Amino acid sequence: MKPAELLAILHTAEHLKDVTRHAYTSGRRHESVAEHSWRLCLMAFFLRDEFPAVDMDKVIRMGLIHDLGEIFTGDIPTFLKTDADTQTEDDLLAQWVATLPAPYCEEMAALYAEMNALATPEAKLYKALDKLEAVIQHNESPLDTWSDNEYSLNLTYATDTVAFSEYLVALRAAIRTETEAKIVKGE
């Protein structure tokens, strides 16, 4: 890859640092999409011993690229995102990916197809971590930053997504315990 090509990719990806998510950090500022993606990858790194049969390098690659489409559309909270929003994001992302140099355009297109199909252990794990990271972040944010629907959503979000793994079911239960304690405490 030529240096100018790499710089063009990085300049585009940099926009994820400015795309904010619905959630807040513990310091009361909106979390960026880049921060969410980073911590999803950090989760994958630390869970490699729990999933020895899973290609964790692939899960980390999925985590790194999973929200790049939000460069073009911004972040839309899951409870507001429509199928049309998803299609627009996917279309704009595919247009950008097609401009990338080989073999990266092919690799990314294949990863996105695998992620969307949710048929492999890697895709299932990436998706579970994506959702779990969001709930963990909400638990870390001040309660007064939550929208009304998040009190129930944060108790159930990702429950279906983690069902394939006993470890993730236990992790989700631990996260729910934190959510319940946060709500009771009122902070």
Place the predicted regions along the sequence by residue.
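Active-site helical microenvironments for divalent-metal-assisted chemistry
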Residues: 1-187
